[in-house]
């Protein structure tokens, strides 16, 4: 089944800024969105892993989606993370996002309850039938302990009209190769791991859902644009420049490092919600994170 690709290029997996007293910092969120669009991104992803989805209340979800749609103002598609390990809840979140005006949905493989491949397929089919909006599957087995098998993703792409792509964060090149070799027309295959973006593009992929773009939208968009234009020499150069910072984003649990970088830039507080905790200001890990970005942008290393 052919699809209309939701985007091609970079979609930042946006952090959710919080104030020091744990409220949503809508002003910082809107500034972040403007910076991303000015940097050249092709879409926005809100309420994903990097957006601390598990600790966001239902009311806050509405506020975040409304703020993202208002700030984007039609300039790029807004994709909302609505997948959970509860199908009914995922349906409710998906319908609410579509009703608010979301352009697409990000549906993660169910975590903790570890369904069969058939169970996951039924989960997605149920969401798609209820929400009737483009769906990007999200495969991140390191977080969920569940791997979306290529044959399952391809079955859904062929049989379910709204399944329009996959964010692949398994790190499995063979799996990515299978998806790219057998996908239907218009089915997007995106890197969900910044460090894997260059190889995915070289294999014919369509872009990335990115963590590092929160702080470096322009340089990361240059990498992806070069790869999509088959200018692999330029893409390799950008990859080499960004690689230390890409790796630094995962020296502690995402989004802790990237939020600290954004805070060092003066864009937001470094606050994350429990059970995540911010890095200690004097920790060696924090120094390594900020130092990795210091060659690329002017961050304050305390």
UniProtKB/Swiss-Prot annotation:
Pathway: Amino-acid biosynthesis; L-lysine biosynthesis via DAP pathway; (S)-tetrahydrodipicolinate from L-aspartate: step 3/4. Pyruvate binds at residues 50, 209. Disulfide bonds: none annotated. Gene3D superfamilies: Aldolase class I. Keywords: Amino-acid biosynthesis, Cytoplasm, Diaminopimelate biosynthesis, Lyase, Lysine biosynthesis, Schiff base. One of its GO terms (molecular function) is 4-hydroxy-tetrahydrodipicolinate synthase activity. The keyword Amino-acid biosynthesis applies. It comes from the Bacteria. SUPFAM superfamilies: Aldolase. It catalyses: L-aspartate 4-semialdehyde + pyruvate = (2S,4S)-4-hydroxy-2,3,4,5-tetrahydrodipicolinate + H2O + H(+). It is found in: Cytoplasm. The record marks 49, 112 as: Part of a proton relay during catalysis. One of its GO terms (biological process) is lysine biosynthetic process via diaminopimelate. GO terms for cellular component: cytosol. Its EC number is 4.3.3.7. NCBIfam families: dapA. Catalyzes the condensation of (S)-aspartate-beta-semialdehyde [(S)-ASA] and pyruvate to 4-hydroxy-tetrahydrodipicolinate (HTPA). Belongs to the DapA family. Homotetramer; dimer of dimers. This is 4-hydroxy-tetrahydrodipicolinate synthase.
